[in-house]
Amino acid sequence: MPAKIHISADGQFCDKDGNEIQLRGVNLDPSVKIPAKPFLSTHAPIENDTFFEDADKVSFINHPLVLDDIEQHIIRLKSLGYNTIRLPFTWESLEHAGPGQYDFDYMDYIVEVLTRINSVQQGMYIYLDPHQDVWSRFSGGSGAPLWTLYCAGFQPANFLATDAAILHNYYIDPKTGREVGKDEESYPKMVWPTNYFKLACQTMFTLFFGGKQYAPKCTINGENIQDYLQGRFNDAIMTLCARIKEKAPELFESNCIIGLESMNEPNCGYIGETNLDVIPKERNLKLGKTPTAFQSFMLGEGIECTIDQYKRTFFGFSKGKPCTINPKGKKAWLSAEERDAIDAKYNWERNPEWKPDTCIWKLHGVWEIQNGKRPVLLKPNYFSQPDATVFINNHFVDYYTGIYNKFREFDQELFIIIQPPVMKPPPNLQNSKILDNRTICACHFYDGMTLMYKTWNKRIGIDTYGLVNKKYSNPAFAVVLGENNIRKCIRKQLSEMQKDAKSMLGKKVPVFFTEIGIPFDMDDKKAYITNDYSSQTAALDALGFALEGSNLSYTLWCYCSINSHIWGDNWNNEDFSIWSPDDKPLYHDTRAKTPTPEPSPASTVASVSTSTSKSGSSQPPSFIKPDNHLDLDSPSCTLKSDLSGFRALDAIMRPFPIQIHGRFEFAEFNLCNKSYLLKLVGKTTPEQITVPTYIFIPRHHFTPSRLSIRSSSGHYTYNTDYQVLEWFHEPGHQFIEICAKSKSRPNTPGSDTSNDLPAECVIS
């Protein structure tokens, strides 16, 4: 079974003996954001109220994966050398029928998914992700069930009329099934995150994190809505965890499930806004209809407003022609009659001061309608805070304390993964009771230029993290020029994120990039016609370059089993999947079979002894071994490898140190010249060296018979079954460089193509 993961004194993942390990994998699978029955992708048009009326009757079974297909998907991931899965699930999938009404059939399906993953070639490490985007599917994203919006007094059926949220579903022609109008006129690229700045999402997050402070009148069944929502959310998560342990305790005992992440990409809502009558200067994303908070309040009450519109330009977001929105009598809030019916259905009893058919921020005196018609903002600074850290160090910590305590009551040894808001440092928890030695910090990173423009710009890049965190006196200083500098800038950003996280949580807490990736529908989906994924390859290689330089573990966003060239990941026009069934016919693998070893020419370049599982050589770490009960004469996972359907495979398939007998110092894979450099500090041991460093060396880049290896010390064995190099090196500072020798220009001594490194290795 997979070995238990430990954390070293300097915050690195390691085994029980202190040998550092690296976690690499994917998010599997974004289909969990949408129901499977009925299949309700975001390109399913909303034609009538059944979208809302039947929301409590949906089922998510078969999302993330159809059970019978699990083995083939996991073998594909193992073909990349991956050992880790981030398994998202949504609150809606667990509790869509109503508060406390759990879908145990779906939970049991998840148990079966986990069990089947664990049975495939020794399984994978898996951690659970309570996923959300802009609060809910009904506010333009994914996550919370519909009843949470009703709980806040919202009428989601009127979000379109009041601009309280933008849903992709409203921009689909029911007759043609296609989007209405041109992309930038109807549903612009990456417009869905603007919901974070619209009435529905901002209100829900404000209530979730700060309801007791900002909405004291909003109590339900004797609880403030903050406690009510957090309690239901945490209970749903822990009910799933308990169900897994009840039905399949071996998933925990075998180190298959390694931990739980806190809420995906939490948001502060209105908390911290200093003036509700203006768009905050620090807001970098302005696209499409962009109301101020006060304008959102008015629109939610059915009041006509003229608001700013922004469009995407080469130089950023530019203000365009204002537009007037007339809700035509519709409100974003439940009428008295509607709310009475909802409250009766869910057995809710509200505070008598909580009036229906009215904005809750008007209810709390933030604004009012004077003389029966004129809206007036009374408290523009109602949500302001003394400094920008108040939310993360107070409101967020209050929430995190709740889930931390519940999870630690459930299990003391599993990892708990704390995730702060996107591109922001975590709270300062040093010396806190809710920071223990099984805590990990989650970071997410997407290159701003690549994400928003869906292209790989080799000329201009932006230090997104530095810009968001005000590390520049002038935004112009965040601009970088040239592809090499852009790559270095991304590496610097990831390093800064790690540094900032450790400054808040301490050096002993590992940093794990639980989401990082690129859009594949670049350049208006040109690659889907030409099969030229060079832009995607360059963008992904830049991320790989950045991650491996700092020994950062990661799970790419994402692997989507239902991806298509037309609709991408079937959610809000996102297309991040590294694999697509539509790309399977385009792949012809000429390197899938294990090559027959050839003797290396005599030279100062070290030769490599190859072995198979029959040879009795030292085996790779447990999570890439074949099952103990599997006949070793049978094909191993890598010999079954299936690389068809992967996009930008050259950049995804990378060498990396699976387990280091010592401590990591530096690594770099050069995709252009097919070379890999690893520097480490070998562990000092009094005995003869018997424990190697294991390095995944994929045949896709490195044909075993043409490996050129130089190192500072030691000898090696290459296991062709597993594509793993076992390097037995000396203690202290060591390096190894592995190159793929060109057929046309063999790497002979003294040639221009060789890299002269200080020492030769012992030939095994």
From Swiss-Prot:
Entry membrane topology: Peripheral membrane protein
Molecular function (Gene Ontology), one example: steryl-beta-glucosidase activity
Phenotype upon loss of function: Resulted in the accumulation of ergosteryl beta-glucoside (EG) and fragmentation of vacuoles.
Pfam family, one: Glyco_hydro_5_C
Any one GO cellular component localisation term in the record: cytoplasm
Gene3D superfamilies xrefs: Glycosidases, Golgi alpha-mannosidase II
Phosphothreonine modified-residue sites: T594
Enzyme active site: E515
Enzyme Commission no: 3.2.1.-
Compositionally skewed regions (Low complexity) per UniProt: 601-622
Major subcellular location class: cytoplasm
InterPro entries: GH5_C (IPR041036), Glyco_hydro_5 (IPR001547), Glyco_hydro_5_CS (IPR018087), Glyco_hydro_b (IPR013780), Glycoside_hydrolase_SF (IPR017853), Glycosphingolipid_Hydrolases (IPR052066)
Annotated segments matching region Disordered: 588-629
Catalytic activity of the protein: ergosteryl 3-beta-D-glucoside + H2O = ergosterol + D-glucose
UniProt subcellular location: Cytoplasm, Cytosol; Vacuole membrane
Record-stated family: Belongs to the glycosyl hydrolase 5 (cellulase A) family.
Note: Present with 1070 molecules/cell in log phase SD medium.
PANTHER family: ERGOSTERYL-BETA-GLUCOSIDASE (PTHR31308:SF5), PTHR31308
Function recorded in the entry: Ergosteryl beta-glucosidase involved in the ergosteryl beta-glucoside (EG) catabolic pathway and vacuole formation via hydrolysis of EG to generate glucose. Is also able to hydrolyze cholesteryl beta-glucoside and sitosteryl beta-glucoside to generate glucose; and C6-7-nitro-2,1,3-benzoxadiazole (NBD)-GlcCer to generate C6-NBD-ceramide (Cer).
Name of the molecule in the record: Ergosteryl-beta-glucosidase
